[in-house]
Amino acid sequence: MSNALARLTGFSVAYRADGTSGVSLEAIDLDIVAGERLAIIGESGSGKSTLALALAGLLPANAVVSGRIAWPAYGHAPLPGRDYGFVFQDAGSSLNPVLSVGEQIAEVAQHHLGMGWFEAFGRAEELLERVRIPQPEAVLRAYPHQLSGGQRQRVCIASAIAARPKFLIADEPTSALDVVVQAEIVSLLEELVRDYGMTLLFVTHDIALASGFADRIAVFRGGRLVEAGPADDVLSRPKDAYTASLIASHIDLSTPPLIAENAA
């Protein structure tokens, strides 16, 4: 694709431990299109989080990589914080417990945008308001342990976009939250991606969650890319039995008709 933000070609990752090597990703060919919302779907151990970490340059030291990731939109490997933001699954461990919320967000803006501390702190307050945190001026001076799980994840999102990146990677950002807060966080991410013109890579095990907002879906299983395509096509006409089973597992009495029913 000529408008690819990132292009993976024959990309593989294995983890070395105790003299053995276990494959996490195997020969992945995948383009991430600039401006799209791409959902990476898979069960635990599918390699989806390894993909997110690889794109962010955050693989651990015992990772053995082959193949290639190219960045046509940048011409160079993107700079963490500046060119891409990363939202982790566990907001609690992502935040520094001894720094205030405002300090943590302002630090990103100060470092990457060259703002003075006063200006950066003002941007932190604006971002807290932007991610729909009530009383942002009070939360600015709060510490992570004083916030709810949903509020902490909003703070992490604010920090991830503080330097105005064009690429946002969200690795299972809702899995530790209740259903209502999950929907709120997804809605917030949708809004931010649209308003700021970002590309979103959203990693999740929940294909039903992704079905509501993704432009494209890529399904992973056992380190392999099972199928990828426009969300409507994957959801209504899955090519692989595994994808069909993921869809079927979410169709029950408590789930609105997802997918194939919508095409009927």
Go through each PLM region and give its residues.
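C-terminal boundary and immediately downstream tail of ABC-type ATPase nucleotide-binding domains
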Residues: 134, 235-264
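Conserved ABC ATPase signature
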Residues: 142-147, 151
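ABC ATPase "signature
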Residues: 225-229
